[in-house]
From Swiss-Prot:
Domain Obg: 1-158
Disulfide bonds: none
Originating organism: Ligilactobacillus salivarius (strain UCC118)
Cofactor annotation: Mg(2+)
Domain OBG-type G: start-end pairs: 159-335
GO biological process terms, semicolon-separated: ribosome biogenesis
Protein name: GTPase Obg
UniProt-listed HAMAP family: GTPase_Obg
Superkingdom to which the source organism belongs: Bacteria
Gene name of the record: obg
Principal location: cytoplasm
């Protein structure tokens, strides 16, 4: 089964907790702190695997978790950092944050990697908190939580040349003749349900990848037929071979086919019409094909759909008429056509930097049970990294809140001594 869109969840590993420990050695009185730092949590990294052709592996495995870092140990020993978790994806996968719509990366090269969730830093042990005023602190940090994200993966086939056209115009037959690909071929519409790739190798040493894309029909850009499900794959192609059935056996007018398919491409992405397009007049071995082609060329000469009138090449995949000329001409056009920017490059090129005020370190709201609720990314991070098993760590957290202005802000909101205040799942009394 061909799967080209999927949503997954990733969660990086939590950092290891720092340790509170003290040296207890003979002849070393008051040995001082000896708690080590925790190790870094594992990150989650997407990596291109050239052996994959679909996202089907993600259908039954959509949640990925990296391992946490090891906790700090006695004698100042650091915890081991966790190994990163690698997830293999096909070449041509775009990665988007499913909640914000932000494009995170476009994996188009064979060795591309993308960090989609960073592992948390390890918490500091009590060695790091020693000072002249407090030479033996009972303070240690918990490890930082790893990043969590919901991702949308979208595969766009990587091919130099894309075959487009109505169903049953001969796209799969052409691919099977000029490459070693074996697409399904039958005399009914939508025989091709997934993109098929093949390598065209010419006798002069040149080669390129050709993609047979499922047939389009009028309204495809609005979801008719197979809809835009496969239109996305045309985005990657540098040259478009537009196959048109000149035999007329389907009862359609070849010129109308040309206009309708280009209109669908335009609605989906207007820049597709800027790409080199060669009209491939197929099934030229049929009786009425020559007459239909002559009428088509007259209409095409007056057409303004594309910036310039496209070149027309006649072929018959059955008799192999014109195939050598077509494949060589396509290679010539490819050589003069630069590679298109990846989505990530386009995003970077068009990025507009604007001033954005920093989010407040904390927010104060009131719950329905009259409890005051503190929230905010910075405050919640401090809370999660505080080890409440030690009184000194708790006092340090209270000082941090005071330094952030939380106490004063609560008083301004009308909080009085004895009122309940909650941070995530931790509730305490406000003390004046």
């Amino acid at each position: 089964m061909f799967v080209d869109q999927i949503k997954i969840e990733v969660k990086a590993g939590k950092g290891g907790d720092g340790m509170v420990a003290f040296r207890r050695e003979k002849y070393v009185p008051n040995g001082g702190p000896a708690g080590g730092d925790g190790g870094k949590g594992g990150s989650i990294i997407l990596k291109v695997d050239q052996g994959l052709r679909t996202l089907m592996d993600f259908r039954y495995h959509r949640i990925f978790k990296a391992k946490p870092g090891q906790n700090g140990m006695i004698k100042g020993m650091y915890g081991r950092g966790a190994d990163d978790t690698y997830i293999s994806v096909p070449q041509g996968t775009t990665v988007t944050d499913a909640e914000t719509g932000e494009l995170l990366g476009d994996l188009v090269e064979a060795d591309d990697e993308l960090v989609v969730a960073k592992g948390g830093c390890g918490g500091r042990g009590n060695i790091k908190f020693a000072s002249p005023k407090n030479p033996a602190p009972e303070i240690a940090e918990n490890g930082e939580p790893g990043e969590e994200r919901k991702l949308k993966l979208e595969l766009k086939v990587l091919a130099d040349v894309g075959l487009v056209g109505f169903p049953s115009v001969g796209k799969s037959t052409l691919l099977s003749v000029v490459t070693s690909a074996k697409p399904k071929i039958a005399e009914y519409h939508f025989t091709t349900l997934v993109p098929n790739l093949g390598m065209v190798r010419l006798d002069d040493g040149r080669d390129y990848v050709m993609a047979d894309l499922p047939g389009l029909i009028e309204g495809a850009s609005q979801g008719v037929g197979l809809g835009i499900q496969f239109l996305r794959h045309v985005e990657r192609t540098r040259v478009i071979l537009h196959l048109i059935d000149m035999s007329g056996v389907e009862g359609r007018d070849p010129y109308d086919d040309f206009v309708k398919i280009n209109e669908e491409l335009k609605v989906y992405d207007p820049t597709l019409l800027d790409r080199p397009q060669i009209v491939v007049a197929s099934k030229m071995d049929m009786p009425d094909s020559a007459k239909n082609l002559a009428e088509f060329k007259v209409k095409l000469a007056k057409d303004k759909t594309l910036k310039q009138v496209p070149e027309v090449m006649e072929i018959s995949s059955l008799t192999h008429q014109g195939l050598k000329e077509l494949t060589h001409r396509t290679a010539d056009v490819l050589e003069s056509t630069p590679k298109f920017e990846t989505l990530a490059e386009k995003e970077q090129a068009s990025k507009v930097y604007t001033f954005k005020e920093d989010e407040p370190a904390f927010k104060i709201t009131r719950d329905s049970d009259a409890t005051w609720v503190l929230s905010g990314e910075k405050l919640e991070r401090l809370f999660k990294m505080t080890n409440f098993n030690h009184d000194e760590s708790l006092m340090r957290f209270a000082r941090q809140l005071r330094g952030m202005g939380v106490d004063d802000a609560l008083r301004e909101r009308g909080v009085k001594g004895g009122d309940l205040v909650r941070i995530e799942d931790f509730t305490f009394e406000f003390v004046e």
